[in-house]
């Protein structure tokens, strides 16, 4: 469980944590930013905070109500990501490829009454279905 006091998760924070299957955030989370990035010259290098974690299946950010930005490639290549919950009512800004390569059957759960806003927002459209947290 990531402590409520964390405001930023930097790029590559979980790089190499291949056994990580679930990420949860403590109630009252102050998280505002999840870092990321991408570099390409002769070969590509992705450095999102949670990118390319082959066993990551669930991210529960339902306690996070203040997210502003999800960085480039933050969850890139998380092929097993099936459930993503977020408590922020206004869809956070997602930079390029934030959710590229996630499971094609992935579910996004958002605060009640906010599903349409997430469905219309760039990058959030990558989720197969979007429903309320209470559904």
Task: Describe each region flagged by the PLM.
Residues 1-8, 18-33, 41-45, 51-69, ...:
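Structural signature of tandem-repeat unit edges
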Residues 95-96, 119-120:
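Short glycine-/acidic-enriched loop or helix-start segments at secondary-structure transitions
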Residues 121-126:
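Helix-loop-beta element that forms the nucleotide-linked donor phosphate-binding surface
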